[in-house]
Amino acid sequence: MAPCYCHLENRAALKIEGEDRKNLLQGLISNDALTLGRDRAAWAALLTPQGKFLHEFCLVEQGETLFLEGEAERLPDLTRRLTLYKLRSKVTLTPAPEFAVVALFGAGASEKAALPETAGAAKPVFDGIAFVDPRLPDLGLRALLPRDSFAATLESAGFEPEQSGAYERLRIGLGIPDGSRDLEIEKTTLMEAGFDELGGIDWKKGCFIGQELTARMRYRGLVKRRLV
C-alpha cells in the first residue's frame, strides 16, 4: 500500500499551555506527562476515581504548548474535567480547531516524515507536528496539521487520500480502541482495554486518578474480560 492519509474527523486538538501544564497532567492521567517533549508523544487516559474509563488521548509537545488530541464530540467534557482539577495551577486550556488530526499510514509513511518506526517518536513536519502512533507503530503516524492546507501539503509530499476506509480496517484489525466507540464510559477499565500492552500506563510515575484499581487488577490478575 502506498503511503496514505486519512482526516480523522472524529478527533480534535486541545492546546494546554502554562508553566504548570505537565505537573497538572502528571497527577491526573495514566501515563508520564513529565517525559513528553517535541520528540516524544504518549497515549494516556483519564479515569474516574474508581478506575473506570472516561477519556483517552494522545499528547505531544511543541514549543511551550502541549497538544492533546482526543474525541472531538467529547473534548468539551474532557476540558471541563481538567479545568476542575486546575485550581490555581498556571495552565490554560484552549480548543485548537485550526489543526486537523490526520492519520498517515502505509509503506514508507514514517520515512516520508523522517521519523523512525519507534512508538511515540515525534517531530515538527508538514507545517505541524507528527508522531508515530504511541500504541503500535504498525498503525502508522498521527499528525496535527493546519486544517486549511494539510491535504495539499501531504499530497505534494507523496501521500494519497485513503480509499474505502482503509485506515479504519487497519485499526480494527490491529485491535486498537478508539475512544467511546470501543470503550464503555465509566465501565471499561484500562486493563480490559489493553492499555498496559499498548503503552498507555506508566507504572513508575506515581499516583494518578483511578490508579488503585488499575494496579490491583494488574498485580492480582483480576482481568476477567479484554477488548479484542
Regions found by a protein language model. Give the residues of each.
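Basic, glycine/lysine-rich polyanion-binding surfaces/domains
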Residues: 1-228
